[in-house]
Amino acid sequence: HWQESIENIHEWSERYDLKAVIGVDEESIILAAKLSESLCIEHNSLESVKLTKNKYLMRSELKKSGLKSPWFKRFSVHETPKDIFAELIFPCVLKPTFLSASQGVLRVNSFEEFGKGCEMLSDLLAEEKVKKRGGDQANWILVEEYIPGKEVSIEGIVNNGKLKDLAIFDKPESLEGPIFPETIFITPTILDEHLQSSLLETAQSALQALGISKGPVHIELRINDHGNYILECAARSIGGLCSKVLEFKGGMSLEELILRSSLGRNVEKTQLIDKAKGVMMMPTEKRGILRKIHGIKAALAVKGITDLQTTIKPGEMLEPLPKGDRYLGFLFAEGKDQDTVKIVLQEAWSKIEVVSEEI
């Protein structure tokens, strides 16, 4: 289907002067790289983009470049878990090499949990939809040493290989497993300036190692006493509706900023408005068919809440992590400081009641 899309856009480009092709999610960044290459538009190389979409290759490249790395190993879904018991370091994390939004990511603390986790992941990777999306990658599982510490993410734009940081998000809720739902993101960060500079240096080194030289990036890291560890480095902007929380001086949205940058406009002096803002990705907690969501009006009435948007409709399937890949919706808030925003989001979420039908 990609070839058909490329041909259609080539035909369209004969009538219009295309300046940029931008992928907006994990599925479209490869197409964007292929299109840019065929249209001779400046872009990240296809090889670099593919590195960001394969967690094993990304880990290998980052380790080769000298960045801090956990112990890791890739093994086939057809291998017997006992075959690699001798190499394991507990706790460790199991994950598919190609999925996002924490889908399939599991912390395991023992040989027994490792075996059960491998079985669950093998079942997930054998599902038709997942297999089609992953191709050969659906045959592999990545195991890596668990990295303790505080988790943050960096939203940025890269021009000529140089990272321009747009926001550093703190994740104030503990993410220790066994599953890793990304719930609350708050910006601006409350980390001290020295640590922020250190994180940005690590992010810049990762981009250089992976060959990402242009466009939006979303980078996730963990920080502990040993230093900064890259978890993910995606050649796209933040996922879902989370970008709504980013508002720049002059009223610009993240999407407008990305477009301006891709057209060669200077965005170096762009700054976020000076206000604590946050988003909560409302988790899917129970498997079943969604029937109704109660409490939306009560949640919106909580002081500090600016918006609530649901993304799963009544009649649709609810599938929690680690197998699911969709959030119930998004809650947005603002306040005088990070603690206020966190409390507001948690209070609003407490008003929500999900009615579902078990299957």
Question: Locations of the language-model features?
Answer:
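Peripheral (often C-terminal) accessory segments that flank ATP-dependent C-N-forming ligase machineries
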Residues: K64, L259-I359
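Short beta-strand-to-turn element immediately C-terminal to the catalytic PLP-Schiff-base lysine
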Residues: F75, V105-S110, I157-N159, N224
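Conserved N-proximal alpha/beta basic substrate-recognition cap immediately N-terminal to
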Residues: H1-V77, P322, Y327
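Phosphate-binding site of ATP-dependent enzymes
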Residues: E119-E173, H194, S198-E201, H218, ...
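Active-site "cap" helix and flanking loop/linker of ATP-utilizing ligase/carboxylase catalytic domains
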Residues: S197-I219, D225, A234-R291
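Conserved anion/nucleotide-ligand pocket segment
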Residues: F90-V108
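Conserved ATP-binding module of the ATP-grasp superfamily
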Residues: K68-P70, P91-L94, F111-P148, I179, ...
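Short, well-ordered beta-strand elements within core beta-sheets of diverse protein domains
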Residues: L106, E145, T187-P188, E247, ...
